[in-house]
Amino acid sequence: MKYSAIALSMVSLLALSACDSAPQSSAPASTEKGASITLAQAVNHDDRTPAYVQRDEYRHPQQTLEFFELEPSMTVVEIWPGGGYYSEILAPYLANEGTFYAAHFPEETQSDYYQRSLTKFKERLTSEAVFGNVQLTQFAPVTPLETDIAPPSSADRILTFRNLHNWYMNGGEEAVLSAFRQFHQALVPDGVLGVVDHRLPEAAADDAMANSGYVKESWVIELAEQAGFELVESSEINANPKDTADHPNGVWNLPPTLNVEEGDDASVYEAIGESDRFTLKFRKPVQ
């Protein structure tokens, strides 16, 4: 299969401090080949979107990527990167030694939202030097496309953040299985799949997954294992014990969406914060 890529010209990389012990403020506005930066530097660089930085309190990007054992020389695929919260971190981190595929929404999608999101992401790729090494591919969970998210057996890491519930809500269990199978095909043996999503309590009714935006951790593990993965470890990095996962408008009641009905008190949901999330690390076994 073929795959498409957007590659931008790369210019000089500013020298960055090698200290990991505290947040550093730098500006890797360009991605010329040279010494790799640390993950802490990638998380704390000055080119990140301020609104995204404010969400680090709940999304814990450095701890999450460390849990997935990223290295700057790896080939990494981010699935459905949206506006680029994680791409802003991954692009400069992988610029000098690694390869970064952003597998965004399908080009031929009928969804206006998907088209707008993809168009905005493309604009960022062509206008912001921090994205100079990004190779743009596309991903569809239900029906695999003629193009790949990355060449088969090439990716060291595949990462998906808060996407799986959408695949289930729009395509059911088979869409999730199809996604996992595509990831399995793209990963190298011993490669890692990292999954973060909104967590539905195990005691809740299964049908709550249909429209709440929350899914059960045990169910995700079961489907990943059906697709050939082994669970390596789970983490509570992105847990939020304040979130009951039982809201009138599902996860969208909570920040950052705050989809609150007229007359409801938004401060109740702001006090909860962003959703309770599971963080799972799977491995593609060596045959």
Residue ranges and their predicted role:
Residues 15-18:
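C-terminal motif of bacterial Sec signal peptides marking the signal peptidase cleavage site
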Residues 20-22:
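Bacterial signal peptide processing site
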Residues 35-71, 85, 89:
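Class I SAM-dependent methyltransferase Rossmann-like catalytic core
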Residues 73-82:
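Conserved class I S-adenosyl-L-methionine
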Residues 91-92, 174-189:
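A short glycine-rich, Lys/Arg-flanked "PGG" loop and its adjoining helix->strand segment in the class I
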Residues 101-103, 190-198:
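Conserved beta-strand signature within the Rossmann-like core of class I S-adenosyl-L-methionine
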Residues 147-159:
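A short acidic, Gly/Pro-enriched loop at the edge of an enzyme's catalytic core
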Residues 227, 267-287:
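C-terminal lobe and adjacent flexible extensions of AdoMet/dcAdoMet transferase-like proteins
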